[in-house]
From Swiss-Prot:
Native source organism of the sequence: Solanum lycopersicum (Tomato)
Coiled-coil annotated residue ranges, if any: none
GO biological process per UniProt: plastid membrane organization; polyprenol biosynthetic process; response to cold
Family: Belongs to the UPP synthase family.
Key words, A-Z: Chloroplast, Magnesium, Metal-binding, Plastid, Transferase, Transit peptide
Record function comment: Uses geranylgeranyl diphosphate to catalyze the cis-prenyl chain elongation and produce polyprenyl diphosphate with a chain of 35 carbons.
Listed name of the protein: Cis-prenyltransferase 7, chloroplastic
Xref: CDD domains: Cis_IPPS
GO annotation, cellular component aspect: chloroplast; chloroplast stroma
Subcellular location: Plastid, Chloroplast
PROSITE patterns: UPP_SYNTHASE (PS01066)
Active site per database record: D61
Length: 287
């Protein structure tokens, strides 16, 4: 997980074009898509928008392995992953997805080598504190929120996070939520403590506590669509790794075998369109 990218790449011939019948005409060469994703078409392909896909979450996994496989540094692996986040962000915007949540840095990642962690903190500050990137995201109408315990970061990084949120808070385009120093367990714990304090102070009673109230205390209260419809995880790992444990209760899961920096536009499209085949029952019978 551990990489982050904001600046969008220039337009290319490999793009999605919206049409009047709520479909995208996707023109690209799909021959390079990995066979385990069952994509083997080449040429024009008509891709229908998945209904009900409002919130997509992603666990970016495989940056260090990717770098090792190519004889590159871990730093280069994280930068390569940041470029692929740009691709996914653009796709989600074009498809009309409302929310994209990116697991950028977990509370467990502090155990990584000090050199790697220091680089990531500098990379976050470089990207988030960039006036060029801030202007671009403001211009493109994207809203940015950060969830997780930000108090541990340097003052300069905390200020950059606050400026990014403040400058984009009224934007109505894709809402990008970046989980940084985030833990699903800690999110539940802090919400529980917050409610307990309110009960102790007389602001709430025990009878007032229900799922809706609890969700208002979670970090994801910053969005109307707090529960992801689809979670994408790369590198072949099949676990959620302490990410959004409450919010993922009914989320559809998609596991890609490719390492995150190896993911191409067509791979992300395959992941997003997989949502069309899911039957979401929420514990009940198929409707």
């Amino acid at each position: 997980m551990l990489s982050l990218g904001f600046s969008l790449p220039p337009p290319s011939d490999n793009k999605l074009i919206i049409t009047n019948n709520n479909q995208y005409n996707y023109r690209t060469n799909l021959a390079n898509v990995c066979s385990n994703n069952n994509v083997n078409a080449v040429g024009d392909q008509l891709v229908t928008l998945p209904e009900g896909l409002k919130h997509v979450a992603v666990i970016m996994d495989g940056h260090r392995r990717w770098a090792k496989n190519k004889g590159l540094t871990v730093k280069q692996g994280h930068r390569a992953g940041g470029e692929k986040i740009q691709v996914l962000t653009r796709l989600c915007s074009q498809w009309g997805v409302k929310v994209l949540t990116i697991f950028a840095f977990s509370t467990e990642n502090w155990v990584r080598l000090e050199e790697e962690v220091d680089f990531l903190m500098k990379l976050f500050l470089e990207l988030i504190g960039s006036q060029e990137i801030l202007d671009e995201w403001t211009r493109d109408g994207r809203r940015v929120s950060f969830i997780g315990d930000k108090s541990i970061f340097s003052k300069s990084l905390q200020e950059a996070l606050a400026v990014m949120e403040e400058r984009t808070k009224f934007n109505s385009g894709l809402h990008v939520i970046i989980a940084i120093n985030y833990s699903g367990r800690q999110d539940i714990l802090q919400a529980t403590k917050s409610i307990a304090i309110k009960v102790k102070n007389g602001d709430l009673t025990v009878k007032d506590i229900d799922q809706s109230l609890f969700e208002q205390e979670l970090d994801t209260h910053c969005t109307e669509f707090s529960e992801p419809d689809l979670l994408i995880r790369t590198s072949g790992e099949k676990r959620v790794s302490n990410f959004m444990l409450w919010q993922l209760a009914y989320t559809e899961l998609y596991f890609a075998n490719k390492l995150f920096p190896d993911m191409e536009e067509a791979d992300f499209i395959e992941a997003l369109t997989s949502f069309k085949s899911r039957q979401r029952r929420y514990g009940g019978k198929k409707i």
